[in-house]
Amino acid sequence: MQPRQDQPALQWTPANMERPRAFPFTGNSGIQVRTVGFEPIDYFTLFINQDLINYFATETNRFAEQFLSGDDVSRRSRVNSWYPTDPHEMKQFLGLLFLTGIIRKPAINLYWSTDPLYSTPLFGAIMSRNRFQLLLKFLHFNDNAKMPGAHDPSPDKLFKVRPLLDHLGEKFGEVYTPSCNISIDESLLLWKGRLGFKQYIPLKRARFGIKCFMLCEDSGYTFKFKIYTGKENVPSPAGALSVSERVVADLMEPLLDKGYHLYIDNWYTSIPLLKFLFDHSTLACGTIRSNCKGFPDPVKKAKLKRGEVKAYRSNELLAMKFKDKRDVLMLTTIHNEEMVPGQRLAAHHKPRCIVDYNKYTGRVDRTDQLMQPYDMARKSLKWYKKLACHFLQLATLNSFLVYKKDHGQKALFGISA
């Protein structure tokens, strides 16, 4: 599925408050599973269920066996004390791992310290420090013996976490369906080590790391995600698409033709993309770059004073420039050029499309902010374990947001979102 290419030249005329075409919203939004009588832990197990924990135990045991059968294990190594784990112990281990994100200490061994100043006896009551560290060392999510070779024509760079990502991707889509207003943006998981698909995004808090495209509802619920692993070899005609258009088409696929309103930033926004979405009964609004092909020159080159707006229309498309502290270029199929009061008392009126854009974007950054205080990933972890920890926490946040859908704005354990 892809936007149409080689569109004919658009005819732009000054906008005159035409009411844009609206598609009825037909998405079956809300919780898609029965939650009557659920305790808080039951919302968690909607995403991280017993089957997944059983799988973790199986693959952890498999990797430990593969590691210990190697020739480079010293007789005196602590790993020789390993014995197979089981789902019950794996659940205990994951519970302690999550707890390390709530009770922050600079080193793992301090959780087992008996010093009265910072002891946490719960950890030692559940398992020994050595056992926890062994489980963390051997924690695995796929069978290394099945990993594609270096010369494979299309290697899966996320092989080590693929089953976990596939499981959570499926559950995110099954448990809850977003309401009408959604957004797509990228999240950046901090990683400064060596990695072939590490990205640099200067405006993100982490700046260096693993980039993940996320489709979120305005509540913050993550419905779908896609991890960027480098340029893809996509067969024609999809290979002719820009990366950003391909990302949006992929993430939006299950929500097309249902009247959704999508908000995106200038990395994604293009005229072909918004026309493609419109052809699939999906409206969109986004900031756009000044060099975007087809954007009308009278709007692009307009010299405006603060608070002034210039808008042109071509059928369903509205192109706009608004002068605030700086020029803001917008492209939308949702709005006309209506102006509404700004949020501050002394603020100028602003185009409604900018007010709505500011309201419905930024959810991915908000998700990152909500998870950051409870980060359970240590700097010493390998990249795939850090990525796994991140998505386990994302699943936990999604479970909390579903809990809130059932219980209103009530906080849980002092945590609110």
Regions found by a protein language model. Give the residues of each.
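N-terminal initiation segments
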Residues: 1-275, 281-283, 287-292, 335, ...
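An anionic, glycine-rich sequence signature occurring as long contiguous blocks
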Residues: 4-43, 283, 294-392, 398
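Eukaryote-specific, cytoplasm-facing alpha-helical/coiled-coil scaffolding segments in long proteins
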Residues: 117-126, 298, 302-303, 417
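A short, flexible helix-boundary coil/loop motif
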Residues: 406-417
